[in-house]
């Protein structure tokens, strides 16, 4: 998927990106989206694996280009928070795997927990950071869905950061307000 398709996923129609089986999702009052600019940090989606709409495990591989004029650079480096946020395509993957059809626009995404480890230097201009993101499983308790995920970020095949024990869920506005 191209950057333009990622931006369409963020701003526009899910069906235009993933196909007509997702048309109903475009009518929901809320759905999972990648962030729009300036926080769109997915420049390409190289591959997506897993049965579409299955609420099962899956994998997505993305890349983020660290450009010389990137708004977020600090001292010629990508800040820790941006390096982590650039692994944001778990959003695309959970939608592809069917969470929007399950929650029907009544619940929204919240990251609950994760453990991040840095293995090397922070990304610099000219680097391309590849994120290999895996959703291990979805669980449901009543109407609440959670999923568990992890990712590895590399530059030229060298480990830069990893996230383990990632957990995100889908909650109503009332549940979020009272949490």
Regions found by a protein language model. Give the residues of each.
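Catalytic strand-loop segment that frames the active site of acyl-thioester-processing enzymes
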Residues: 1-4, 15-24, 28-32, 36-79
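HotDog/MaoC-like acyl-thioester-processing domains
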Residues: 1-12, 43, 53-56, 61, ...
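Hydrophobic beta-strand-centered segment that forms part of the acyl-chain substrate-binding groove
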Residues: 5, 13-27, 33, 38-39, ...
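Active-site helix/loop of acyl-thioester processing domains in fatty-acid/polyketide metabolism
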Residues: 45, 68-69, 78-106
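Residue-level marker of positions within ordered structural domains that often coincide
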Residues: 50, 67, 92, 138, ...
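Short Lys/Arg-rich amphipathic alpha-helical segments
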Residues: 69-73, 104-106, 121, 156
């Amino acid at each position: 998927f191209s950057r333009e398709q990622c931006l369409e996923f963020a701003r526009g129609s899910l069906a235009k990106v993933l196909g007509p089986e997702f048309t109903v999702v475009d009518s929901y009052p809320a759905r999972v989206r990648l962030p729009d600019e300036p926080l769109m940090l997915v420049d390409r989606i190289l591959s997506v694996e897993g049965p579409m709409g299955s609420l099962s495990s899956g994998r997505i591989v993305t890349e983020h280009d660290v450009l010389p004029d990137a708004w977020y650079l600090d001292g010629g480096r990508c800040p820790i928070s941006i390096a982590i946020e650039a692994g944001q395509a778990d959003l695309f993957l959970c939608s592809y795997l069917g969470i929007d059809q399950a929650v029907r626009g009544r619940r929204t995404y919240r990251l609950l927990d994760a453990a991040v480890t840095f293995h090397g230097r922070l990304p610099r201009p000219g680097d391309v950071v590849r994120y290999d993101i895996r959703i291990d499983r979805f669980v449901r308790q009543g109407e609440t869905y959670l999923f568990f995920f992890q990712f590895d970020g590399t530059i030229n095949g060298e480990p830069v950061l990893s996230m383990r024990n990632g957990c995100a869920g889908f909650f109503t506005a009332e549940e979020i307000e009272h949490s």
